[in-house]
Each structure stands twice: as structure tokens, then as C-alpha cells.
Amino acid sequence: MTRILGIDPGSQRTGIGIIDIDEGGRSRHVHHAPLMLLGEGDFSQRLKRLLQGLGELIEIYRPDEVAIEKVFMGKSAASALKLGHARGAAICAVVMRDLPVHEYAAKEIKLALVGKGGADKVQVQHMVGIMLNLNGKLQPDAADALAVAITHAHVRATAQRLGVNTQQAWSRKK
């Protein structure tokens, strides 16, 4: 059994999604939630909350591997910079615990789950619910984090079948 933590970084909310993968490659939902950062003071305090909160979740759930969404250029350069800082804090929380980090672009995640890189958030959320047998509407950030974890599980399974590492299995990765 392998436990994968998926992270959808954000400066206001960071999505957390945890799944277990059995020896047959089947995914099982363990936990998902948004890590709320608003109301935590100034931006540096939000980063501290992210670093600490994610560290606590890692200690509780003990993932074997971590997958995180790459930064994309959104509405503004300032937003992208804040997102980059949040992503950096999340990666620090992971690597400080000697866990491997795997990175996936939003298009790669959408392609892995829906079959097309231009899928919208509703389609991704729907597929996450189906794949993990979850009922009801999923909180968007947590659903995105579960999608990152599922993507890594698929890439990992392909890598194992091919006898290569995960970076080689997903050719568009850096």
C-alpha cells in the first residue's frame, strides 16, 4: 500500500487530498480538506500557517509520496508570485520530512483525469468523485488536490509497468 498526498497550493486556501493505492493499483480515498489560510494575519503569517498545517497533516497521515500542482500564470503577476511563495512553503514542509515531491501542470492533471487538457474544474471534480466513489459536491481546492494525487498514482503505475522512474514516465515533465 502506498499513500499519496496531493497538494493544490494557494495563498488563501491550499487543497489537501490523500489517497491510498493498493498493490493492484486501486485508489482509496483517505482524507481531503482545504487548509484555510485567510484570517491568519499578514501574508508571511499565512505562509507560516501553511508550513505548520501541512507539516501536521504529514505527521498525522504519513504519506509515502507527495504530488503538487505547478504554478501557472493567472490573473496577475502579483497573484502568481504569491502562489509561488505558497507552493514553496508547501514544498518546504514536504522536503523537511524527506518525502519525494512530484510536480504536475494543470493541463497534465486534466489530461490524466478527464482525457483532455482543457477540461474545466467541474469535469475534474466529477471524475474525482467517480474515481474515488465520493458522493456530493467536493470543495474545489480539495478536489484539485485529490486530482493531483490520482494523477501521480497513474504516472507511478505507468512507470512501474515500464520499469522507469516517474519523471521518465511522464515525458512532458521537467
From Swiss-Prot:
Its EC number is 3.1.21.10. Mg(2+) 2 binds at E69. CDD domains: RuvC. The RuvA-RuvB-RuvC complex processes Holliday junction (HJ) DNA during genetic recombination and DNA repair. Endonuclease that resolves HJ intermediates. Cleaves cruciform DNA by making single-stranded nicks across the HJ at symmetrical positions within the homologous arms, yielding a 5'-phosphate and a 3'-hydroxyl group; requires a central core of homology in the junction. The consensus cleavage sequence is 5'-(A/T)TT(C/G)-3'. Cleavage occurs on the 3'-side of the TT dinucleotide at the point of strand exchange. It comes from Xanthomonas axonopodis pv. citri (strain 306). Belongs to the RuvC family. It catalyses: Endonucleolytic cleavage at a junction such as a reciprocal single-stranded crossover between two homologous DNA duplexes (Holliday junction). The lineage of its organism: Bacteria, Pseudomonadati, Pseudomonadota, Gammaproteobacteria, Lysobacterales. This is Crossover junction endodeoxyribonuclease RuvC. Homodimer which binds Holliday junction (HJ) DNA. The HJ becomes 2-fold symmetrical on binding to RuvC with unstacked arms; it has a different conformation from HJ DNA in complex with RuvA. In the full resolvosome a probable DNA-RuvA(4)-RuvB(12)-RuvC(2) complex forms which resolves the HJ. One of its GO terms (cellular component) is cytoplasm. SUPFAM superfamilies: Ribonuclease H-like. Binds 2 Mg(2+) ion per subunit. It is found in: Cytoplasm. The active site is at D8, E69, D141. One of its GO terms (biological process) is DNA recombination. PANTHER family: CROSSOVER JUNCTION ENDODEOXYRIBONUCLEASE RUVC. NCBIfam families: ruvC. The gene is ruvC.
